[in-house]
Amino acid sequence: MVIPTRDRRGLLLRALRSVLSQRSIELEVLVIDDGSTDDTPDAVRSLHDPRVRVLRHEVPRGVATARNAGAAAATGTWIALLDDDDVWAPDKLVRQVTAAQRASARWAYAGAVEIDGEGRLLGGERPPSPEVLVHQLTRRNLMPAGSSNVVVDAASFRSSGGFDAGLRHLADWDMWLRLARYGHPVCVPEPLVAYRLHTAQATLDTRGMIAEARVLRDRHGADLNSIRRWLAWSHLRRGRRREAVGAYARAVASGDLRSAGRAAVAALHPRPTAARRRPPNPADVEWTESARAWVRAAAED
């Protein structure tokens, strides 16, 4: 499995502990140090775990390149990816690999919950079915927790070409679209990944993402207006009403009249996200709570 990292020693060690605690599966762990200036390499080596190797880039090359470097060095039959600030449940890998093998699927994902900067459980919702996820990929990226979730057959990863290092924002989305050509993934519906939300994630580079969305359109037939609406919704989730209105307005200007009403709601409602917020589904609350024990354990030093 592959973990790219740069200057996040503390978070990385927590992520690594969740990896090294995986049950009933053989592990090869490749930490790709993408030009760290802190003591990340020494901290990883201090674990003295023979399953862990550090590959270092003296100059930062970006997350996509780091992931590809790790995948190229991996010797296993499956490749799993984990961002250095996320954590896994102890049975995450074995359940995904077993499910993929039983279904003869080339890739797999699971449910995910959100945690805060201190590792406290914030919430979550059940993952989409494989059919819904793949059907929506040209419109929205519904993969819970992104790359930290997915396990891919190594041969399929390599034949897909790996992550596009030219895409700074949407390389994950591009990869799922390419993997979908091999068939639907299999889903383990329980929450097995915890995705960390940071204050820094409150901003989005809308211009850069739209530019890359055009690449997805040209490469995969992605619906550009749907992606604009998805970006606007992402702004609303972060409470960035002005940016959401702008994103909807650009969609309207490009001929997407469906966004006109959404722009009005975003502009006029004092708390735009509340306009569509529904009471939590008791089943989803129970589903999320099922992750609390392992999330709490992963947050411990």
Residue ranges, per PLM feature:
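Conserved donor NDP-sugar-binding/catalytic core segment of glycosyltransferases
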Residues: 91-122
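A conserved acidic beta->alpha catalytic loop
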Residues: 18, 33-42, 59, 83
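C-terminal subregions of glycosyltransferases and related glycan-biosynthesis enzymes
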Residues: 197-301
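Short, acidic, metal-binding catalytic loop of nucleotide-sugar glycosyltransferases
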Residues: 17-26
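Acidic helix N-cap motif at the loop->helix transition within catalytic regions
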Residues: 10-13, 36-46, 87, 91
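Glycine-rich, basic loop-to-helix element that forms the pyrophosphate-binding segment
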Residues: 57-74
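Conserved nucleotide-sugar donor-binding catalytic segment
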Residues: 124, 129-213
